[in-house]
């Protein structure tokens, strides 16, 4: 399935662009999709100049080449990919992710990029998000838990390190030592690992919001998967239940 040529929607306001996405969602409105995508890093501005520069940098073509390579390597599902300019004004997004991000579902993927992103950076965010797609297809559930979420993120960033390079892992992978993460697991994550993704506590723990350590769940998941990879391959872990992955580590 080809990369969707969202660059051809350049003249439209982001909210108008989201009307084109309605067929890809169940019971969704353009405004609902717009709010969801902007919450995860899409720019709320029209951004004609940004899109023009992205076209000049051949962002869409580069993503397509990288995607085909990755899909073949992992034997992953063929899904549509939508590319939009990212929010360059969000300070935390810029600090933690260099203003690049994405959003993955089992049947589609969104990337939020800017003209300055190099091919390796694009490969990193695509690898991260596409690993989510593969994991969600291998472990389909009606309700995902906090444990599922941290393992999902841990697998994704470990994939970046292994398939793109350690230098392209997100900054949050270096925030805490292994000892600190072990303490976080016992104090914050383990007691609430069964919390559903719809529960307000889920995102507070996953992202480390409020008084919780920044990027808490991501950091714990990264270390868990790092240990599990000493015993199993990445493609094997993608297929294992979250609980089984934890059992392969000292976090049990």
Q: Language-model segments: which ranges?
A:
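N-terminal low-structure segments adjacent to metalloprotease catalytic domains
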Residues: 1-54
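Post-HExxH zinc-binding segment in Zn-dependent metallohydrolases
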Residues: 113, 146-185
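Inter-helical turn/loop segments and adjacent helix faces that build the functional surface
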Residues: 137-146, 165-171, 231, 235-236
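Short pre-active-site segment immediately N-terminal to the catalytic Zn-binding motif
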Residues: 110-125
């Amino acid at each position: 399935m080809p990369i969707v040529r969202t660059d051809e929607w350049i003249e439209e306001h982001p909210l108008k662009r989201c009307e084109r996405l309605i067929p890809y969602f169940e019971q969704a409105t353009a405004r609902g999709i717009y709010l969801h995508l902007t919450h995860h890093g899409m720019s709320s501005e029209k951004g004609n100049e940004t899109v023009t520069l992205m076209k000049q940098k051949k962002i869409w073509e580069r993503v397509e080449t990288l995607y085909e390579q990755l899909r073949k390597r992992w034997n992953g599902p063929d899904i549509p990919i939508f590319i939009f300019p990212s929010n360059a004004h969000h300070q935390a997004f810029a600090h933690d992710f260099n203003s690049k991000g994405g959003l993955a579902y089992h049947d589609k993927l969104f990337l939020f990029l800017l003209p300055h992103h190099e091919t390796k950076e694009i490969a990193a965010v695509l690898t991260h998000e596409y690993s989510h797609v593969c994991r969600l297809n291998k472990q389909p559930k009606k309700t995902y838990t906090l444990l599922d979420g941290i393992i999902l993120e841990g697998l994704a960033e470990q994939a970046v390190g292994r398939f793109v390079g350690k230098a392209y892992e997100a900054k949050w992978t270096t925030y805490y030592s292994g000892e600190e993460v072990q303490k976080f697991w016992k104090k914050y994550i383990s007691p609430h690992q069964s919390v559903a993704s719809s529960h307000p506590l889920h995102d507070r723990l996953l992202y480390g919001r409020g008084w919780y350590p920044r990027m808490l769940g991501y950091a714990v998941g990264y270390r868990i998967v790092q240990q599990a990879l000493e015993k199993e391959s990445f493609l094997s872990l993608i297929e294992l239940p979250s609980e089984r992955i934890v059992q392969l580590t000292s976090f049990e």
